[in-house]
Amino acid sequence: MTVFAIEYHYPADSPQIIELRPAHPEFLGKLKEEGKLIGSGPYTDGDGDALIVIQLDDSATIADAEALMADDPFHTNNALTGRVFHTWNPVLNIFGV
């Protein structure tokens, strides 16, 4: 499997993020059911932003990860100030992937 770490950037006090928050976990829940979501959550330092970690097939590329995340309500409603996709190698793999 190829693992991707995705950074979501947004202001902590964004009214749009707050409004869309119920729809975002629903989207992530579908990824979890499909076995693609490893974990996700906001950073707790008060600056906003979040990390999402997903797994796709060995041949998957960043473009594949971007396509998978394209329907996230945070993205489709332009609530994010940025998204950064990385391939990631969990060397000390405590995630079971």
Each language-model region and where it sits:
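Conserved, structured core segments of small domains
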Residues: M1-V97
